[in-house]
Every structure is written in C-alpha cells, then in structure tokens.
Curated annotation (Swiss-Prot):
Name of the protein: Phosphoribosyl-AMP cyclohydrolase
Subunit relationships: Homodimer.
Known catalytic reactions: 1-(5-phospho-beta-D-ribosyl)-5'-AMP + H2O = 1-(5-phospho-beta-D-ribosyl)-5-[(5-phospho-beta-D-ribosylamino)methylideneamino]imidazole-4-carboxamide
Family annotation (Gene3D superfamilies): Phosphoribosyl-AMP cyclohydrolase
EC number: 3.5.4.19
Function: Catalyzes the hydrolysis of the adenine ring of phosphoribosyl-AMP.
InterPro entries cross-referenced by the UniProt entry: PRA-CH, PRib_AMP_CycHydrolase_dom, PRib_AMP_CycHydrolase_sf
Cofactor dependence: Mg(2+); Zn(2+)
Involved pathway(s): Amino-acid biosynthesis; L-histidine biosynthesis; L-histidine from 5-phospho-alpha-D-ribose 1-diphosphate: step 3/9
Protein family: Belongs to the PRA-CH family.
Source taxon at top rank: Bacteria
Gene from which the chain derives: hisI
Length: 116
C-alpha cells in the first residue's frame, strides 16, 4: 500500500480548500443515489491520495492516522465525484460503496438515531 502521507495536493486545488486550524476539512460522503453515508475528516494528503487513487481516504482524529476505507473491513469506497461547497470548507464525495459505510457495518452512519 502506498502511504497517503507521501501524496501532495495539487496547489491549484489546495488554494481552494479551506482547511481548519488542525489542517482538516470535513468530507460528507454520499452514494451515487444521493444517500448520505458518513462524515469524515481529510487533510491535504488524504485528499490528494483520494484524488489520485479514487479510494475514500480519511484522517482519523482519534487514532491520528490515515484510514483508507475498506482496507481492513473490505467495505470499500470507489470515488466517482468530488466537489467543494461554496465556501471551500467542506468536501462532498460521491462513492460506490461496497458493504457498510459505517464502522458498525451499517450501510450509513445516519440510520441509528433518527430524531424527526
């Protein structure tokens, strides 16, 4: 496996992304049918790796390490689209999800605690 930390974000993209003070940007991940699957965090290296490989790759704040979705679970994400919101401070990724997107194994992280 390549190391996501070795990937550099294209400067023309980097200047458009507003990373927070920790160097992270939230990524909303949705399926190709528009279902929201999860929210995760990316740094510039994770974003660069995702663009280069088309594999959903994130930065785990709790483990302080890169996380390529499906590397251990087999529940992979093939990225088919990636865009920034109007402020450049959120990434929207469209993926073909194989297996569950949630760490619990569920398809989405947003089906366990429905409030309304």
């Amino acid at each position: 496996m390549d190391d996501p930390a070795s990937y550099e974000l294209d400067p023309s993209i980097a200047q458009r992304v507003k990373f927070n003070s920790a160097g992270l940007v939230p990524a909303v991940v949705q399926s190709t049918d528009g279902e929201v699957l999860m929210l995760a965090w990316m740094d510039a290296h994770a974003l660069a790796y995702t663009i280069a490989t088309r594999k959903g790759t994130y930065f785990s704040r709790s483990r302080n390490e890169y996380w390529i979705k499906g590397l251990t679970s087999g529940h992979t994400q093939q990225v088919t689209g990636l865009q920034l919101d109007c402020d450049g401070d959120t990434v929207l990724m469209t993926v073909v999800q194989q297996g569950g997107a949630c760490h619990t194994g569920d398809r989405t992280c947003f089906d366990a605690d429905v409030i309304i």
